[in-house]
A protein has these predicted regions:
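Helix-loop-helix
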Residues: 1-230
Length: 230
């Protein structure tokens, strides 16, 4: 067992085996629970990244004004913009790092699921973890998690498109966010359905978190507006 398998694969095998036991061997529900747990773990980072995105969206008029005023001096313009970011405690790289981090997780899980599907898990299991007698690879009675699923690919692309439009991302970020699910849609035949199911669960929790952030932001704006009026 190499270092990658020891640090990434073995914990995933054991955690998924534990979740599969809780779901009576249903791998589909175990994967959805795994997606929810991972999403909750990275929630603080996501919240910070989205907070920076909202601040940057509000600062766009000032940024455009600086760019217009100093269009002949791009270096100075960038310095002024970075000064604003520093004053507002904004890290413009947070959202990019978060996207790449999500992709790194997805790629790791892609490799993991490709190996785990249909293979023997016992060599990777800790002594205190028991695998269910039978793993059910049929989700909702008709989706074979071992094979590609056009239905799940369409659901994934649709959910991610919706998420992209409700997030306060810049144009470049939106292209990255919108492009990834459609890559899955176009190349879904290369992905076992279990991977797409994970991404569907991950995105559903993401949408819920985005709703919570939007609601909190609206309440803050209303409070500020009321104080200003008074």
């Amino acid at each position: 067992m190499n270092t990658f398998e020891l640090l990434i694969f073995q914990p995933l095998y054991n955690f998924l085996a534990l979740l599969s036991g809780l779901t009576k061997g249903n791998l589909g529900w175990a994967v959805l629970i795994l997606a929810a747990i991972i999403r909750l773990i990275i929630w603080p980072w996501y919240k910070k990244a989205m907070g920076d995105q909202r601040k940057m969206a509000k600062l766009q008029p000032r940024i455009k004004e600086i760019q217009k005023k100093l269009k002949e001096e791009p270096i100075k313009a960038n310095q002024e913009i970075m000064k604003i970011f520093k004053e507002e405690k904004i890290n413009p790289g947070n959202s990019f790092f978060f996207i790449f981090f999500q992709m790194a997780i997805f790629i790791s899980l892609f490799i993991f699921f490709k190996q785990a599907i249909g293979n023997d898990w016992s060599p990777y299991l800790y002594s205190f973890i028991k695998l269910p007698e039978q793993i059910n690879y049929l989700f909702l009675g008709f989706i074979n998690l071992k094979a590609p699923s056009l239905i799940l690919a369409i659901v994934s692309a649709s959910l991610n498109s919706f998420l992209t439009f409700i997030q306060p991302s810049s144009g470049q970020n939106k292209v990255m966010l919108l492009g990834f699910p459609f890559i899955i849609l176009f190349f879904y035949q290369k992905f076992p359905a279990v991977i797409i199911l994970y991404w569907v669960g991950f995105t559903l929790i993401n949408i819920l978190q985005e709703y919570m952030i939007n609601k909190h932001t609206q309440e803050e704006n209303q409070t500020i507006s009321m104080k200003t009026t008074d």
